[in-house]
Amino acid sequence: MYGVLLVLHGSKIKEWQDVAIQYANLLRKYFDLVEYGFIEFNQPSITEAAKKLASNGVDTIIVVPLLFAAGTHFKRDIPKQLEEIKGVKIMIAEPIGVDERIAEILKERVEEVLRSSTRS
């Protein structure tokens, strides 16, 4: 059995917690066991979230970073925070990267701004 661990950067701004909850809830439409963890600033940490999945009986944790690029957090910090998780296979998905679907969302945001500016 596997669980999904959504990893977010985190921020001193409280709204990051809300974003994490909303994304985790969206993923729960597709996967039974989903938790979220933050690289820094917010709780739960990546380690805490992984331990919660492990305590629910998963034997594999699929880590999904909500990051755009494979920088230091992806290459160093995420694996380091998962080191103490024993007895569970850890698989880390690639960051979002450059993706046409993201470009579509960005295009929509530009169009929204243009529409709203013509109304003012």
Curated annotation (Swiss-Prot):
It is an enzyme of class 4 (lyase). Its EC number is 4.99.1.3. The active site is at H9. Co(2+) binds at H9, H73. HAMAP family: CbiX. Belongs to the CbiX family. CbiXS subfamily. The gene is cbiX. It comes from Sulfurisphaera tokodaii (strain DSM 16993 / JCM 10545 / NBRC 100140 / 7). This is Sirohydrochlorin cobaltochelatase. One of its GO terms (biological process) is anaerobic cobalamin biosynthetic process.
